[in-house]
């Protein structure tokens, strides 16, 4: 199985840009590329899929606290491709707390036995780049840097200085560089990168990136490195789940709601349930279903359109009142509230929960956390431990009673606790994004309610 992992010394060094360029260049050479993303991010994976035509898979060792399961999922998705390309997250050794193996890119590299290509930001640096590469190469004896790509290089002469220094002071090969070019920059939004659905002229960007990578990076050497990787020897069986054949699961899928982990959707299909997409923006009503799943996204950007689609809002509220189970994450919670406040205006939402979502100018919650239901809920029984991730700028002001205790830990110590998550009838909503592969009991609890 050929594989590489694109990592960086820090966030903002150019991992995504380099990764996308490599994916496009490999695709143009005729390779079938399977993309992966370290961590819980939903947005970079949209870019990956736009280029490769294949769903990108999240590899997150916090959300799935089972090394063998992670390796098994990686193997399952990558074995039929010509090459697997993993995009890292943050800096190579950054994760949860100070443990370099806790939810970090480096841990995923070791778990999947994948060679690491380090992206170094070349802006305003020359010989010091060698110190960065040498330090990263020595930091973990179990992990070696297989190659380096320099980003944001000012000129050929600038690249020669950096390359010469790295090759003089380390034994890590320099595979090439990307020149500074504003045309390949990706604009940002409050949740990170702008979703692919709203980008224009994407194909031109991908083509430019591909041309730059092909011109300035030794792709043959990169492919050689990918072939030198160790094979995985994982025998972990796929998660055993109950049979829910015949269960109809309607899930929101449009520009406002599209944050879903591909493995979650695959696991739903593995139960035998039927996934039926619908659009809260465009459709008149929710499809006839036994279960409704509303993922995250950007309801605030489409608040007026969601407000104006009264028939859809009424049909979801009617489904709730009939007792059809509804599970909603983050943007889904905002949609199920009474209203959404955006730029001083209020827009009516579904109204399952009595609460107003208000957008703020900063991140309100960010990062991994552990949730514990304080009562029986749609996603878990009282006292159950559920791993998740929150990332949002909105606050949900409500009179509803929260049904979960949430906490953040750093290096074994609880650093923050709060309450969240709301259960009303058979409807559950929270800001928490979860991965179903962490525990089969979560999906069984949810679909069990839909089957009754």
Swiss-Prot record:
Could you say which EC number(s) this protein's record lists?
Answer: 6.3.5.11
Pathway-wise, it operates in:
Cofactor biosynthesis; adenosylcobalamin biosynthesis; cob(II)yrinate a,c-diamide from sirohydrochlorin (anaerobic route): step 10/10
Give cofactor(s), names only.
Mg(2+)
According to the UniProt record, what class of enzyme is this? ligase
User: Its Gene Ontology biological processes?
Assistant: cobalamin biosynthetic process
Q: Does the keyword Magnesium apply?
A: yes
- InterPro entries xref list: CbiA/CobB_synth (IPR004484), Class_I_gatase-like (IPR029062), CobQ/CobB/MinD/ParA_Nub-bd_dom (IPR002586), GATase_3 (IPR011698), P-loop_NTPase (IPR027417)
Q: Where is the active site?
A: 330 (nucleophile)
Q: Where is this site: Increases nucleophilicity of active site Cys?
A: 433
Under Gene3D superfamilies, the record lists:
3.40.50.880, P-loop containing nucleotide triphosphate hydrolases
* Family per record: Belongs to the CobB/CbiA family.
Mention any additional remark. Answer: The a and c carboxylates of cobyrinate are activated for nucleophilic attack via formation of a phosphorylated intermediate by ATP. CbiA catalyzes first the amidation of the c-carboxylate, and then that of the a-carboxylate.
> According to its record, what is known about the domains?
Comprises of two domains. The C-terminal domain contains the binding site for glutamine and catalyzes the hydrolysis of this substrate to glutamate and ammonia. The N-terminal domain is anticipated to bind ATP and cobyrinate and catalyzes the ultimate synthesis of the diamide product. The ammonia produced via the glutaminase domain is probably translocated to the adjacent domain via a molecular tunnel, where it reacts with an activated intermediate.
Among NCBIfam families, the record links this protein to: cobB, PRK01077.1
* HAMAP family hit by this protein: CobB_CbiA (MF_00027)
Q: What is this protein called?
A: Cobyrinate a,c-diamide synthase
Origin species, per record, is Listeria innocua serovar 6a (strain ATCC BAA-680 / CLIP 11262)
């Amino acid at each position: 199985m050929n594989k590489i992992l694109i990592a960086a010394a820090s966030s903002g060094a150019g991992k995504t840009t380099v990764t996308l360029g490599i994916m496009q260049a490999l695709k143009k050479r005729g390779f079938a590329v399977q993309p992966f993303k370290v961590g819980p991010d939903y947005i970079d994976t949209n870019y990956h899929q736009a280029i490769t035509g294949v769903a990108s898979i999240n590899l997150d060792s916090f959300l799935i606290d089972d090394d063998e399961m992670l390796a098994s999922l990686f193997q399952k998705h990558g074995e039929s491709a010509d090459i697997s390309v993993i995009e890292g997250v943050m800096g190579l050794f950054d994760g949860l707390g100070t443990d370099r193996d806790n939810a970090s890119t480096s841990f995923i590299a070791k778990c999947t036995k994948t060679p690491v290509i380090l992206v170094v930001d070349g802006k305003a640096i020359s010989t010091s780049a060698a110190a960065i590469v040498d330090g990263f190469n020595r930091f973990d004896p179990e992990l070696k840097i297989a190659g380096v790509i320099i980003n944001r290089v000012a000129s050929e002469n600038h690249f020669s200085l950096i390359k010469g220094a790295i090759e003089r002071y380390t034994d890590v090969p320099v595979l090439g560089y990307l020149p500074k070019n504003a045309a390949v920059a990706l604009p940002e939004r409050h949740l990170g990168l702008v979703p692919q659905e709203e980008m224009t002229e994407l194909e031109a960007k991908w083509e430019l990136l591909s041309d730059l990578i092909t011109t300035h990076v030794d792709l043959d050497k990169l492919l050689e490195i990918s072939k030198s990787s160790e094979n995985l020897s994982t025998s972990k069986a796929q998660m055993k789940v109950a049979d829910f054949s015949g269960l109809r699961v309607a899930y929101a899928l449009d520009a406002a709601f599209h944050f879903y982990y591909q493995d979650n959707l695959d696991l739903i299909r593995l139960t035998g349930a039927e996934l039926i997409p619908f659009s809260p923006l465009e459709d008149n009503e929710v499809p006839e279903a036994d279960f409704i799943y509303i993922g995250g996204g950007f309801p605030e950007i489409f608040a007026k359109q969601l407000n104006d689609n009264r028939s859809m809002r009424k049909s979801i509220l009617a489904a709730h009142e009939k007792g059809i189970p509804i599970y909603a994450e983050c943007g889904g919670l905002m949609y199920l509230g009474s209203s959404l406040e955006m730029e001083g205006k209020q827009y009516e939402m579904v109204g399952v929960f009595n609460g107003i979502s208000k957008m703020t100018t900063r991140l309100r919650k960010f990062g991994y956390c552990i949730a514990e239901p304080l009562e029986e809920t749609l996603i878990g029984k009282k006292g159950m431990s559920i791993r998740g991730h929150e990332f949002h700028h909105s606050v949900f002001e409500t009179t509803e009673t929260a049904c979960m205790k949430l906490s953040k830990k750093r290096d074994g110590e609880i650093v923050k606790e709060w309450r969240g998550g709301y259960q009303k009838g058979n409807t559950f909503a929270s800001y928490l994004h979860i991965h179903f592969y962490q525990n089969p009991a979560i999906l069984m609890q949810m679909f069990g309610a839909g089957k009754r």
